[in-house]
A protein has these predicted regions:
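Conserved active-site beta-strand-loop modules that form the wall/rim of enzyme catalytic pockets
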Residues: 243-247, 253-256
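Dual-mode signal for accessory low-complexity, basic/Gly-rich regions
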Residues: 220-223, 240, 256-316, 364-379
């Protein structure tokens, strides 16, 4: 006897074409290349060449010129001198390189108006066929703006907790908050169409609940950050671990890693002395929640703590020799955090047990209704 209580899945031939063009519309609008522009692709040997060809195709259709510069891997930690003249002459940059967001030269180019698309999550053209690839980019932007509204326009504290006992906080001044939210990503601008923009494709990896843009990219600025996070997982580990492993911070630096298992010992060797450089959140409801490779889950409410390590790590070099990030970095993951913004007079919950509360913001629900059923769009992965 068999039971059929749910609708069978749609045959691919019924949905494939419409899904493809839906994703292509996102793709062509995010890559907002203009006639006559100079486009530079910062590539690596493991990038699907069809991705490069897709960008070239858009550029050719719009009368733009493309150059491709390749390094031996994505694990470029500083902009190579040989690439700088090409970068200086470009209007639009597509990059797989790790240094894209933090390198001072790259930051300076964006300050001059250069537009960037980072493709950490678009290394294979077949990703256009995923639910994440066709999810409306404007709706991702609405979710991000709703999250930004939960950050008070005042001095406040972001407080973390979870069932494992995490107790971690970051103190924000109004100036820090305004610095962080000023970028195109926190304004929900998902298209690479405004001067100085930096967008992720597939959308979206981040924006971050904290990074050094809150301090105007001053790496020496003190950070009011303290407490312990008990991550549930990390990139480079097959599955979430069962042990309660704690990472205690003083400022942005990890000063203690607790736990007795082999995993805890690996993390202790790896993480002690490491500095938090970004605390990212996912915002695309169709991103797979339990896919944390290569840099953390992009599902709403999934968090990744990006740690720059004190030294290259042997474990990373052994288990991920071709990782897109260098062995001086690690992304810790939580999938069930509660995060609240707290002022002297109020507190507001951004995440509730790993659920991004912005998904039920009235403005987000209204925006989702334009594209279909808000519950199906915002609270399912398929």
């Amino acid at each position: 006897m068999s039971y059929i209580g749910l609708a069978p899945g749609m045959r691919r031939e019924i949905t494939a074409t419409k899904h493809w063009f839906q994703a292509m519309d996102n793709f062509t609008r995010v890559f907002a290349i203009r006639p006559g522009e100079k486009v530079l692709i910062l590539a690596d040997p493991l990038l699907d060449t069809r991705v490069i060809d897709a960008v070239i195709g858009i550029a050719n259709a719009r009368g733009a010129q493309v150059r491709v510069y390749m390094e031996p891997s994505t694990r470029v930690t500083a902009m190579p001198e040989a690439a700088k003249p090409l970068l200086e002459s470009a209007d639009f940059v597509v990059s797989t390189w790790f240094c894209s967001i933090i390198d001072p030269f790259c930051i300076a180019m964006r300050q001059r108006g250069q537009r960037w698309v980072k493709i950490t999550y678009f290394r294979n053209l077949d990703l256009l066929e995923t639910p994440q690839g066709r999810f409306p980019v404007e709706l991702v932007g609405e979710i991000i703006r709703a999250t930004a509204r939960a950050m008070p326009d005042a001095d406040f504290t972001l407080q973390w907790s979870d069932v494992r006992g995490s107790d971690f906080c970051i103190g924000y001044t109004r100036e820090m908050r305004n610095n962080l939210l000023a970028g195109n990503r926190w304004r929900g601008r998902m298209l690479a169409d405004e001067p100085g923009c930096y967008v992720h494709y597939l959308p979206t990896h981040g924006p971050n609940l904290w990074d050094r843009t809150a301090h105007k990219n001053d790496n020496a600025a003190p950070v009011a950050m303290s407490g312990t996070i008990y991550p549930t997982w990390a990139v480079g580990f097959e599955k979430p671990w069962s042990e309660r492993i704690g990472c205690r911070f003083e400022g942005d630096t990890i000063v203690e890693v607790t736990g007795e298992s082999d995993i805890a010992k690996v993390l202790r060797t790896m993480l002690l002395g490491g500095r938090l450089i970004e605390l990212g959140c996912g915002f695309n409801p169709k991103a797979q929640r339990h896919t944390v490779y290569p840099a953390g889950s992009n599902n709403p409410g999934a968090l990744h703590f990006g740690i720059d390590l004190a030294r290259p790590d042997e474990y990373i070099r052994r288990v991920m020799p071709d990782w897109e990030e260098p062995p001086v970095h690690m992304d810790l993951v939580t999938l069930d955090s509660t995060v609240e913004s707290i002022t002297a007079n109020a507190r507001q919950r951004l995440l509730d047990g790993g659920f991004l509360t912005a998904l039920r913001d009235p403005a987000v629900v209204v925006a989702a209704a334009v594209y279909g059923d808000p519950i199906a769009l915002l609270e399912t992965e398929t």
